[in-house]
Regions:
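Active-site-proximal helices and loops of the catalytic beta/alpha 8
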Residues: 22-38, 48-57, 67-69, 74-81, ...
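Bacterial N-terminal signal peptides
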Residues: 6-15
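C-terminal outer-membrane/trafficking sorting elements
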Residues: 548-601
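Boundary/entry segment of secreted carbohydrate-active catalytic domains
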Residues: 22-45, 172-179, 183, 448-452, ...
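Aromatic- and acidic-residue-enriched segments that line the glycan-binding/catalytic groove
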Residues: 74-83, 120-162, 224-225
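Aromatic-rich carbohydrate-binding modules that target alpha-glucans
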Residues: 454-505, 520-525
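Substrate-binding cleft of carbohydrate-active enzyme catalytic domains
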Residues: 93-134
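Sec/Tat signal peptide C-region and signal peptidase I cleavage site
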Residues: 16-21
Length: 601
C-alpha cells in the first residue's frame, strides 16, 4: 500500500510539473544575455565564456548561446544548418568544454539557453541524408517522407530527391531541408533531442529559431514533452497582433507554452532612439501589454538585426546605451546583446543592479509612458519602489521623491527615495569607451564627421548630411567629397567631411548623415553627431574639439580639492592634492577623477 501511495504521489507531481510548464516564469526578475553575435568565434568560445562566469553570473540569470551541434566543420560555422543532434563539437569548442561551461554557470545560479533549430536540417553528405543517431536506448532514423513535399519551393524534388512529406505548415526556408512536423517520426525524434539537451547536456531552456517555419502548436507539444524552464521563439515580425497570435498558438492543455522576442518593440526602439520619433515608444508592444508582458523577451539588437542592412540587419546605430536603459526599465525579460555588453559593461551593470534594486519583473506595471517632442518619460512600478526613466531631452519632469541612480547620454534613471542603491554605487569603473585615431582633429565651431571606410570601398568617400531645414552637402547625391586623413592600425582608411558653410533648403522629416563609396554602396541613414566617428556599423563615438593638450569630454574641471584617481578599468592610483596637479602629472590616457572622466593627451 505504501509503495502504491508513493507511486501515485510521484505520478501526481509529474503531472503537476508538466501542467506548470507555461513558457516563461511569472513575475520573473531575471535578465538574459545573448552570449554571441554573428561570427563571434573567439568571444563565444565555451572556455572564454566560462572564464567570465563569476562576472557574468553577477549580472545575468540566463545566457543564450548558439546551436552547439556538430555541422561537419568547426570552422566559421554558427550552427544554423544543423546536421548532428547528439554530437556537440562546434566552432565554439568541444562537447566536453560545453558541458563544463554549462555546469560552471549552473553552480553560480545562471542557466544556459540553447538555440534550437528544428525548422530545417542539412544532410550529412547530400541534400537529404540525415544521419542515424542513438541516445538513451533510442535510435533516430530519417527518410525522405520526413521532409516537406514542397521543400525549397520544389527545388529539392527537382534535384532528384523524392521527398514525400506533407506540405509545409509554415514559411519555406531555402537553406536547408524543411522538416515535416506533421510526421510522428519527426516529432518523436525532436522530443528525444530536446530531452537530451535538458537532461544530458544540462541546458536550462530553449530559444527556438525561425518559428514562422512551422505551426505554433508544435512548440506547445514539444515543450509539454520536454518541460523546459524557459522557452522563447523567434517570430520575426513587427506586427504585435501576429506575435501575440503565435504565442497564443503555442497553447497546450489550456496554457501558453512559450515566450516570444518582442520584435514590435525592437522596431519602435529603432525609430525612437535612432530617428527621434519618441512617440513610437508608446505604440503597442508585447511588453507594454499586461496580458503578454510575461511572455515578452525584449532586446535592442541581436545577432541578426545587428548585422549591416545589406545582410538583412536592422541595427540601432545611435543611443544604444539609452535604449538598453529603456528595456531594463520596462516589463518583460530584457535580453542584452553581447556586443553592447562589451562596449557598455559598467553602465549596464549599474542599470541591471538598479532594475533589481527596484524589484522590476516581467509583469511590472507601467505607471506612465509619455512622449514629448524631444524625449520620453517612462515610470514603472517594482516590488520595492518605482523607476523613473527620462529619455532624450526631457527638462520638465517632476523628480521630487526620487533619487538619481544612473545617467548617461540621452537618459537619466531615477528610483524612489526609499530604494537601497548600495549595490549600484558599489559598481566602479567606466565603460570601455571609444578612442579615435590621433589624426582625427576637430577645430572649434567646425561642423564635421569622420568615416572609417570598409577595405573594399575604393572610390573617394562622399558624405550626405541634412536636417529638417537644410542639406549641408550640396543637395545633389551623393553629396560632398570627403578628405582622407589617415589610416588605422588595421589598414583601413579614415575620411573626414567638413562643412563648407553653404547649405540648401531641405524639407526632410528627419536628420542624419550617409557615407557612400561615391554613391554606392552606402551606409544606412545614421544619426548625425558633430565630430562623430562612424563605420558602416554606425556611430562609434565623438571626437571633441581640440582646445588644449588636456581635455575633459564630459565636464569642466571642478574646484581644487583632494579627489581619488582611477584608471578607466577602475584601478585606484591615489589622491592628488587637486585635479590640476593630477592632469599635469599623469601620463597620456583616460582617467576617472572625482567620478568624472578626463582625457590626458
Amino acid at each position: 500500500m505504501k509503495k502504491l501511495f508513493t507511486l501515485l504521489t510521484a505520478l501526481l507531481l509529474t503531472v503537476c510539473t508538466k501542467a506548470l510548464a507555461q513558457g516563461w516564469p511569472q513575475n520573473y526578475d531575471g535578465v538574459m544575455l545573448q552570449g554571441f553575435y554573428w561570427d563571434s568565434y573567439d568571444d563565444t568560445r565555451w572556455t572564454t565564456l566560462e572564464a567570465q562566469a563569476t562576472e557574468l553570473s553577477a549580472a545575468f540569470n540566463q545566457i543564450w548561446v548558439p546551436q552547439s551541434g556538430y555541422c561537419n566543420t568547426t570552422h566559421m560555422q554558427m550552427g544554423y544548418l544543423p546536421i548532428w543532434w547528439f554530437n556537440h563539437l562546434s566552432a565554439f569548442g568541444t562537447e566536453a568544454e560545453l558541458r563544463k561551461m554549462i555546469k560552471t554557470f549552473k553552480s553560480k545560479g545562471t542557466g544556459i539557453i540553447e538555440d534550437v533549430v528544428i525548422n530545417h536540417r542539412a544532410g550529412n553528405t547530400n541534400w537529404c541524408d540525415f544521419p542515424t543517431e542513438k541516445w538513451n536506448g533510442k535510435t533516430m532514423t530519417w527518410t525522405l517522407a520526413d521532409i516537406c513535399a514542397n521543400d525549397d519551393g520544389g527545388k529539392t524534388k527537382a534535384n532528384g530527391y523524392n521527398v514525400t512529406g506533407a506540405a509545409d505548415t509554415g514559411d519555406d526556408f531555402g537553406g536547408g531541408r524543411d522538416l515535416d512536423h506533421t510526421r510522428q517520426n519527426v516529432r518523436d525524434n525532436i522530443k528525444t533531442y530536446l530531452s537530451f539537451l535538458l537532461t544530458d547536456l544540462g541546458y536550462n531552456g530553449f530559444r527556438y529559431d525561425m518559428v514562422k517555419g512551422y505551426a505554433a502548436h508544435y512548440i506547445g507539444e514539444y515543450n509539454t514533452s520536454a518541460n523546459p524552464k524557459f522557452s522563447v521563439g523567434e517570430y520575426w515580425d513587427g506586427d504585435v497582433q501576429k506575435v501575440k497570435g503565435w504565442i497564443d498558438g503555442t497553447r497546450a492543455n489550456g496554457s501558453i507554452q512559450s515566450a516570444a522576442f518582442d520584435f514590435p518593440m525592437k522596431y519602435a526602439i529603432n525609430d525612437a532612439f535612432g530617428q527621434g520619433r519618441w512617440g513610437r515608444l508608446a505604440d503597442a508592444t508585447l511588453a507594454a501589454d499586461q496580458a503578454y508582458s510575461r511572455y515578452a523577451v525584449t532586446f535592442v539588437d541581436n545577432h541578426d538585426t545587428g548585422r549591416p542592412k545589406e545582410n538583412g540587419g536592422a541595427q540601432l546605430y545611435a543611443n544604444v546605451l539609452a535604449a538598453n536603459a529603456y528595456i531594463l526599465t520596462m516589463p518583460g525579460t530584457p535580453c542584452v546583446f553581447l556586443r553592447h555588453w562589451k562596449m557598455y559593461k559598467q553602465s549596464l551593470k549599474r542599470l541591471i543592479a538598479t532594475r533589481k534594486a527596484v524589484g522590476l519583473t516581467n509583469q511590472s506595471q507601467i505607471v506612465k509612458a509619455e512622449a514629448s517632442a524631444n524625449g520620453f518619460v517612462l515610470c514603472t512600478q517594482g516590488t520595492k519602489g518605482k523607476a523613473l526613466l527620462l529619455l532624450g531631452e526631457v527638462n520638465n519632469a517632476q523628480t521630487v521623491g526620487y533619487q538619481l541612480a544612473v545617467e548617461g547620454p540621452k537618459y537619466k534613471l531615477y528610483v524612489s527615495d526609499g530604494v537601497d542603491l548600495t549595490a549600484v554605487k558599489a559598481i566602479k569603473g567606466e565603460d570601455a569607451g571609444f578612442n579615435a585615431p590621433d589624426f582625427c582633429k576637430v577645430k572649434k565651431d567646425e561642423r564635421c564627421a569622420f568615416f572609417e571606410a570598409p577595405a573594399n570601398w575604393n572610390n573617394t568617400i562622399t558624405c550626405w548630411q541634412w536636417d529638417k531645414g537644410y542639406n549641408y552637402t550640396g543637395g545633389n547625391w551623393p553629396g560632398a567629397a570627403c578628405t582622407k586623413v589617415g589610416t588605422t592600425a588595421n589598414g583601413t582608411h579614415v575620411w573626414k567631411w567638413t562643412w563648407n558653410n553653404s547649405k540648401q533648403a531641405s524639407s526632410a522629416g528627419n536628420e542624419g548623415i550617409i557615407f557612400s563609396n561615391n554613391g554606392s554602396p552606402q551606409t544606412a541613414d545614421l544619426p548625425f553627431e558633430n565630430g562623430g566617428y562612424y563605420t558602416v556599423e554606425g556611430l562609434l563615438g565623438v571626437v571633441k574639439p581640440v582646445t588644449t593638450g588636456i581635455t575633459s569630454p564630459l565636464q569642466s574641471t571642478p574646484s581644487a580639492k583632494s579627489l581619488p584617481v582611477y584608471t578607466i578599468d577602475g584601478k585606484a592610483l591615489g589622491h592628488p592634492a587637486d585635479i590640476d596637479t593630477a592632469l599635469k602629472t599623469l601620463p597620456k590616457g583616460v582617467y576617472i577623477i572625482g567620478k568624472k572622466k578626463y582625457v590626458v593627451k
